[in-house]
Amino acid sequence: MSSQPLTAANIFAVLRHLRSLCHPTRPVTTASFASSIASQITPSRAYNNYTPTHYTPLSIPKNSALKQWHFVASYSTVPPAKTEKETTEDTSLSKSTKPKPKKPLPAWAVQKNALKEKFKEGWKPRKKVSPDTMESIRKLHSMDSVKFSTKNLAEEFKISPEAIRRILKSKWRATEAEEIDRRNRWEKRKIRIQEQMMELGLRHTDPTSKDDPSAEEVLSQRHYSSNAIEDLSGEYPPQNRRREGIPQKRIVPEDNSSRKFDPWEVTADDLLGTKRDSFRDNWSKEDSPKARSSSSQRHPRRIEYNERSYKEKPDW
């Protein structure tokens, strides 16, 4: 190739010369190619003082181009060696994943876990227990702690053993005012349950309406008069409104003299030493009509329900 500047017109000639180097069948000298390229490179205008002798010619070894073009990439399956930083990170992660030693549980937690294993039902009873029943539980357990144990009392009263344990452990006792208030609330709860049973149809509905107060007054006066006659004669007067042809049921008092003592039927009122400070528990025989009349004025609906329960039978 003639010594001409490397321009766009001479690019094809240079590419053709490079292609000939890739094929070994064509004998091409690398020295002539290097000298031709060095001769075609011209310095820029800023370096006009420099002569072409300052440029070092390209020294390409023999068959270097062939080795570059026929190079086969080789991949290694061996993982690279870890650096010191990576090894320290791995050791820190392995130390953090180790389980920490468990701290000893406090005494209250140990007791709580033991109670959970022993009483699986928990302490919450399946039903509410009246104050009289709780007092009976305490008395029975004090009489014979082996026979009336926690398990036996729980099976008899249908509550959880944990509730029995807490009742026996409790040392709180209600005062006189608190006892009266508790009994009043318990009576209200009993009446509320009876009314709910009436609404569900499990009991006879009350014929008297709640909006008519005169009916309640009539019922209370009727009950008061029947109590007064009972106190004088000793028995109830015959009822004139009985249906004809239906024999009257005669009530015979039960003889309990030959009956054996059953400790499960003992209530707090039958036990000695039971404190009864409520005015409703200390009624005497002389004051019973007065007390019943006062209760009839307070709860006429309950009195009417009790009267109807003796006269009629449910349609179950």
From Swiss-Prot:
Residues 1-27 form a transit peptide. Keywords: Mitochondrion, Transit peptide. Residues 80-105, 197-316 are annotated as: Disordered. The keyword Oxidoreductase does not apply. Pfam families: Neugrin. Disulfide bonds: none annotated. Residues 201-213, 241-263, 272-290, 302-316 have a biased composition (Basic and acidic residues). It is found in: Mitochondrion. The keyword Protein biosynthesis does not apply. One of its GO terms (cellular component) is nucleus. InterPro entries: NGRN/Rrg9. PANTHER family: NEUGRIN. Required for respiratory activity and maintenance and expression of the mitochondrial genome. Belongs to the RRG9 family. This is Required for respiratory growth protein 9, mitochondrial. It comes from Arthroderma benhamiae (strain ATCC MYA-4681 / CBS 112371) (Trichophyton mentagrophytes). The gene is RRG9.
